[in-house]
Amino acid sequence: MSSQTPTAQNLSFVLEGIHRVKFEDRPIPKLKSPHDVIVNVKYTGICGSDVHYWDHGAIGQFVVKEPMVLGHESSGIVTQIGSAVTSLKVGDHVAMEPGIPCRRCEPCKAGKYNLCEKMAFAATPPYDGTLAKYYTLPEDFCYKLPESISLPEGALMEPLGVAVHIVRQANVTPGQTVVVFGAGPVGLLCCAVAKAFGAIRIIAVDIQKPRLDFAKKFAATATFEPSKAPATENATRMIAENDLGRGADVAIDASGVEPSVHTGIHVLRPGGTYVQGGMGRSEMNFPIMAACTKELNIKGSFRYGSGDYKLAVQLVASGQINVKELITGIVKFEDAEQAFKDVKTGKGIKTLIAGPGAA
């Protein structure tokens, strides 16, 4: 991997192929419309999708065919604004929503812009990501951070936005019992959002005890470590150990692992709600008989939509969710490749990469 250039104007972390990355000085982006702003990117979180592109060169139909800047969980400082920008000014600290919809297709007009047919999403081929010094995006996809939210915390508005969308899909209401499978960053944040929405019992499920220990301190009221027994047995044990009666109200899978999907269906009460937030294999077996006979409400969840980022910022600003606890490391920009290697091995919970030239 080539080393970074000290005099670079817009140093970027570029994926060329599987396990092949480089630092490249790219042109400073320009305003594409009067409604755009240019942001000096200060912090970027490493997401599982970034690591997957680095490790495999593709995610499903999205294949890296040309060099692509990685990263999409970012925050920064506004350095330039378009002539029509009214909600931001130079110097504002912002969280950056990295997916820009066309605003014209049927899903966009229906208010589901996360399903936009022409979505331009950062670090999803063929679009460059945010691991660069500068990035351009529309003003309404930048969320001004109050003084109570630091720039490192601002980078976590992206995974928190994902969690907000998942929990909204589940329609979690006060007094409910929610089971969350997968205690990675998104799963942990789902626990926190469910708590903020009034869930009275939140059970975090994972096979790694350290993650369960953290989940219990962070937002979960209970934890469950599944055995290698069939999903029905794990579900029965979870119900018994937590006195869930006929089952949980809501099950959220943030792991994408087939045994979790099965256990999630079986742990629900009749009429309960299941939301698939984690992505695993493109196809897997599914307990359709249990889903039908219990008349479950089953939904998918993809990224985030209208109001999700805004609510994420509000939940942190109000003190209901403390995302700072998830940040287990901040590395220099020149150490980005090693950070990717560390994240692949499961080191830490959320690692941030500081922008070029930052301490």
From Swiss-Prot:
Example GO molecular function: D-xylulose reductase activity
UniProt pathway: Carbohydrate degradation; L-arabinose degradation via L-arabinitol; D-xylulose 5-phosphate from L-arabinose (fungal route): step 4/5
List, alphabetically, the InterPro entries matched. ADH-like_C, ADH-like_N, ADH_Zn_CS, GroES-like_sf, NAD(P)-bd_dom_sf, PKS_ER, SDH-like
Residues where NAD(+) binds: 182-187
Reactions accelerated catalytically: xylitol + NAD(+) = D-xylulose + NADH + H(+)
Q: Which Pfam families match?
A: ADH_N, ADH_zinc_N
Q: Name one GO biological process term.
A: L-arabinose catabolic process to xylulose 5-phosphate
Q: Domain of life of the organism in this record? A: Eukaryota
Annotated CDD domains: sorbitol_DH
Q: Which UniProt keywords apply?
A: Carbohydrate metabolism, Metal-binding, NAD, Oxidoreductase, Xylose metabolism, Zinc
Kindly list the positions annotated as binding Zn(2+): 47, 72-73
Please explain the role this protein plays, according to its UniProt record. Answer: Xylitol dehydrogenase which catalyzes the conversion of xylitol to D-xylulose. Xylose is a major component of hemicelluloses such as xylan. Most fungi utilize D-xylose via three enzymatic reactions, xylose reductase (XR), xylitol dehydrogenase (XDH), and xylulokinase, to form xylulose 5-phosphate, which enters pentose phosphate pathway.
Question: Cross-referenced PANTHER family, in alphabetical order?
Answer: SORBITOL DEHYDROGENASE
| Protein name, UniProt field | Probable D-xylulose reductase A
- Encoded by which gene? xdhA
